[in-house]
Amino acid sequence: MGPRPSTKNPTPMMLTVRVALVLSCICPANSIDGRPLAAAGIVVTGDKAVNIYTSSQTGSIIVKLLPNLPKDKEACAKAPLDAYNRTLTTLLTPLGDSIRRIQESVTTSGGRRQKRFIGAIIGGVALGVATAAQITAAAALIQAKQNAANILRLKESIAATNEAVHEVTDGLSQLAVAVGKMQQFVNDQFNKTAQESGCIRIAQQVGVELNLYLTELTTVFGPQITSPALNKLTIQALYNLAGGNMDYLLTKLGVGNNQLSSLIGSGLITGNPILYDSQTQLLGIQVTLPSVGNLNNMRATYLETLSVSTTRGFASALVPKVVTQVGSVIEELDTSYCIETDLDLYCTRIVTFPMSPGIYSCLSGNTSACMYSKTEGALTTPYMTIKGSVIANCKMTTCRCVNPPGIISQNYGEAVSLIDKQSCNVLSLDGITLRLSGEFDATYQKNISIQDSQVIITGNLDISTELGNVNNSISNALNKLEESNSKLDKVNVKLTSTSALITYIVLTIISLVFGILSLVLACYLMYKQKAQQKTLLWLGNNTLDQMRATTKM
């Protein structure tokens, strides 16, 4: 399937390439280090190069279906060649008629042209409904009408050549290559043995090869016999038609050997029949190739999560499936606009989403910042292979080591177990036997525990349970509020009126004033009493001294 069309205005290709190239020049990208994340149940499964493309290059393949035999040997293979020619005409004439109907539908102007155009497409569609893709393909077929006419102008010279690959350039607006898989067979095999082979052997050889090619043609054009706009021809179908000669056209269009295998796997190289001539048995196919821009410093990193053990049950990490990193910036990558191959991503546009600080910190190696969801069921596969080793949750399954024999136990609090050839050479998990060849070095963190605060609820059933608990708490709170209201209702409202409160405040202030005055008066009286006591004591002492003096005299 192709990339999902955007609902917004598409970004122009040149602007997108410029922006992407600016991003790629920021600084070299470092892929996410999966070693500290593995023990937390987050496994980096691989990286892919990110490319941006647009389908802008086209070229034509002229398939020569009928080979030319040496003049002195034509009589030997006349019978199988005539039968093959008749079968070809019967097989491909509906295809040629459908092509001509669509191309001739543009001869009328105005609204009638549009009706004839759609009618020509629907005429070959079984359900009578023309999809947008079919209309687009038919429009491309009409645009190739002039090129098809130029090819037909050269059809005699193309049919007469004995070359298996012949570049056609006279009067054509785009590169065209004439190829003949059957001619290749005749040139490589038939001419070498014709001198030593009798007529019967020649007829048998040609007949067998032609029958095989007819089978391939039927397979290739099965869905397109009635409508060339129904389906595109895949790169595999084009190779079946042209054989190894297909590489010549791709090389001429600028597809390098380093890109060829990846582009073939992407399905971006497609073809549409644009002409069929039954007189010379020539089949014209317009090939569309993508124009690819490589973003050297951008890679997509794929993440998988493993169900880990926590004190709150089994849970899996909440991280994106695909992230991309440029310099120190890590963002989630939307691959819905991309086509994936084993090593590359081909995208019509680059769409990323920012991540929360917690997820960013988690993917940077701080596993204590990772959040987990209790959404994994008991039937989830509790193990994953990585580089010849195994990361397994040995609390969910029995990790049985066959060589050396023993049971691998997972310590309390550990999220998962990292098992390599150092601890077990042959491992049995759920009846599956794995021979381990990898090794977790010292940089891999182990014995990571998941805290309760890192586990949150995201599953529908779990959320319903938690909502039930919340509802119970709310009900209890409402009951307490009702009790409070009943107690408040018993309070005399008159005592809490505004006038009563003002009276209480005034009386309180007066009481405070009297209290302060009483305190001051008490302090004054105590001070005066102490002064009188000192005076009396002084008078007493004087009198005593005078009496002593009188006695001595």
Curated annotation (Swiss-Prot):
Its main location: virion. Residues 142-170, 466-491 form a coiled coil. The chain crosses the membrane at residues 501-521. It is a single-pass type I membrane protein; Single-pass membrane protein. Pfam families: Fusion_gly. GO terms for biological process: fusion of virus membrane with host plasma membrane; symbiont entry into host cell. Residues 522-553 are cytoplasmic. It comes from the Viruses. The record marks 116-117 as: Cleavage. Keywords: Cleavage on pair of basic residues, Coiled coil, Disulfide bond, Fusion of virus membrane with host cell membrane, Fusion of virus membrane with host membrane, Glycoprotein, Host cell membrane, Host membrane, Lipoprotein, Membrane, Palmitate, Signal, Transmembrane, Transmembrane helix, Viral envelope protein, Viral penetration into host cytoplasm, Virion, Virus entry into host cell. It is found in: Virion membrane; Host cell membrane. Residues 32-500 are extracellular. Disulfide bonds join 76-199, 338-347, 362-370. Belongs to the paramyxoviruses fusion glycoprotein family. Class I viral fusion protein. Under the current model, the protein has at least 3 conformational states: pre-fusion native state, pre-hairpin intermediate state, and post-fusion hairpin state. During viral and plasma cell membrane fusion, the heptad repeat (HR) regions assume a trimer-of-hairpins structure, positioning the fusion peptide in close proximity to the C-terminal region of the ectodomain. The formation of this structure appears to drive apposition and subsequent fusion of viral and plasma cell membranes. Homotrimer of disulfide-linked F1-F2. This is Fusion glycoprotein F0. It comes from Newcastle disease virus (strain Chicken/United States(TX)/GB/48).
